[in-house]
Amino acid sequence: MKGSKQEAKEKQVERDEEAETKEEEEEVNTLHAESKTEKGDKDWEEEEEEEETEVVTEQGEKKTVQSSVLSAAKMANTSSYDPVKDATWKPGQPVPYMFVAKTFEKIEAISGRLEIIRLLTNMFRSIIALAPQDLLPALYLTINRIAPSYEGLELGIGESILLKAVADATGRNLQAVKADYKAQGDLGSVAQSSRSTQRTMFPAPPLTVRKVFDTLYKIAKSEGRASIERKKGLIQNLLVACKDCEATYIIRSLQGKLRIGLAEKSVQVALAHALVLTPPDGQCPPAVLDASKTMSDAKLQQQLIQATETLKAVYSEMPNYDVLLPVLLKERDISAWPTHCHLTPSVPVHPMLAQPTRGVQEVLKRFQDSTFACEFKYDGERAQIHYLEGGKVHVYSRNLEDNTQKYPDIAQNLPKSIKAGTVSFILDCEVVAFDRKTMKILPFQVLSTRARKTVKLEDITVPVCLYAFDLLYLNGESLLRHPFQERRQLLHESFQEAPGLFQFARYLDTSDVEDIAAFLNEAIASNCEGLMVKTLLKDATYEPSRRSYNWLKVKKDYLDDGTTDSLDLVPIGAFYGKGKRTGVYGAYLLACYDDEGEEYQNICKIGTGFSDAMLEDLAKSFKDKIIPQPKSYYRYSEQVCPDVWFEPTTVWEVKAADLSLSPHYRAAIGLVSESKGISLRFPRFIRIREDKTPEMATTGTQVAEMYKSQGLNHAT
């Protein structure tokens, strides 16, 4: 009897799942049908990337730049801002934190990227003109960091500590503060309103940028048994001195999220513009205050573009503002910046990434005029290995996290593969779980079971093998500008394989379609994801932090069902579960990230790929990420409005059957259709991407390219 009841229950669950699937199919089929009628039986033979514009340099050379860079330069060119008269402090005085906080407040109130860049540019210009020594802390406060990301020094203070600090600093009851926080969903706003009603007998001196930054740094560095009370005391000291909107942004900085829709790319553009418009000079004559008065419009525009592109380039090789800013403030010659700021061991760079393709034919079409190599695409964790003279080893993740303590076995085994004469290097490779008895690669899921923090050699249960595929630096010389064929040759000349510990990525240099197909099958049989295809000589330099069409990936899923590449998406909301999913979220609203507009665009509703246990765990994990209303930088349709909204905090890898145009979703809107976005058909959850931040999610531009590529693939 008990068995029959269990069988009946299982059958009911099965019927519920079938009903949910049918309902989902009907919904997406309707959306897909709508996309067919879109003025969209358009020929996608021509690739459509971000619009570019041709400009003429000072030397008379023609150069292509992104239209967004040109637009920002044009707006900066028309600014009437006076960095001294419009500042709120005098030369020689420290920068008031209020000046920065008020800029944040203005940015939060608008959404236009160019206007945001203009506001930031003006803020930086005043700091450069009046207090250049405060530019570094002001910059760190703006990007909400206190040190280079690879140093792992972060804020993100616990909610309970912040609540108590706000209550103690404002003299309010803790329960009242909690109630306000629950109602408003923004502890920064609660802190500000609490301070505005507080009366003090002896007002604290005004906060400065340096004071706030130094205090945040002390809080982040505070460790030990008494650290909680010490942190709380430091926070209270800041809050007691706050005026106007300062408390809002100090609390948000402590939470680790400014939440004003500001991306680091915009900060870099603003900084570049400020350095051109108000060059650092140590004095304030009119020419220094406003470079536009001594240059023609055309020349100024060229310098703004040059500074923007050069700053982005040097930061991609030296992502450390402590090193960069002194150079930028001292070196007036923009073209000289790269000579001072370049690839250096112990400073990791964001890796070069590949564009997805839908099959071998697309690869051949894109690389028809180039020689190229096919490599096994290993299913592991991307790693950048830095080896310093003297033998010190650093292991960094693709997100620039220092994973050296996670992989002590790599540091121990690597010297066995280093040939004589190799004294320093930076390797790009994949860490893969490996069975040394069978000498076979293990699935990524096995690797993910390894402990993430301080690991002892004797406690390791999942051995790993390092598969090296690129060499970025060797014996004091950067190889970034060398073609891939030369870098690969140096890699093989400088290292030797140690089976099961250190191996070279399997590769094949060919342009024969049958050879590529056979090699792809061989990769899949070896438990790999598919192939990486890379140009060998033409356009074959290594480009840090860029997803390039000179690297393409072909994954095994294409052989199974012709589906699209996976996407990395951010859950921004959820829908209450029904039936067997009562008590947990039944589905989630996912978004891609538009790095130009600095917004999250909804792309699909997902409820497939989760186990019951996972749904329960997710519901618990999102409990403290619920917000009362969507962010100003969430772009969505009222037709797909979730029951609850979340902070953008995590990234999920998702697969889908296809992509289609939809009036209910906003992903890539304006890139394929002016009125419709792109949605995923039959999305399913694959895994959580712990190595990615929300800003590293799939972009709207990438979604549009995947949609067009799918049309191209169907046509071939």
Task: Report residues per predicted region.
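C-terminal structured "cap/appendage" subdomains that terminate the fold
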Residues: 622-681
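Short glycine/proline-enriched turns and hinge-like loops at secondary-structure junctions
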Residues: 386-388, 543-547, 565, 580-586, ...
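C-terminal catalytic or substrate-handling cores of phosphate/nucleotide-
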Residues: 491, 550, 559-560, 658-696, ...
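Active-site lining segments that contact anionic ligands and/or coordinate catalytic metals
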Residues: 380, 463, 528, 549, ...
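Extended hydrophobic-aromatic, low-complexity segments
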Residues: 395, 579-585, 598-605, 612-617, ...
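Metal-assisted phosphate- and nucleotidyl-transfer catalytic regions
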Residues: 495-543
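Flexible, glycine/threonine-enriched loop-and-boundary segments that flank and lead into catalytic domains
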Residues: 352-374, 378, 513-519, 535-578
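N-terminal nucleic-acid-engaging modules of covalent nucleotidyltransferase systems
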Residues: 1-512, 589-591, 595-609, 634-639, ...
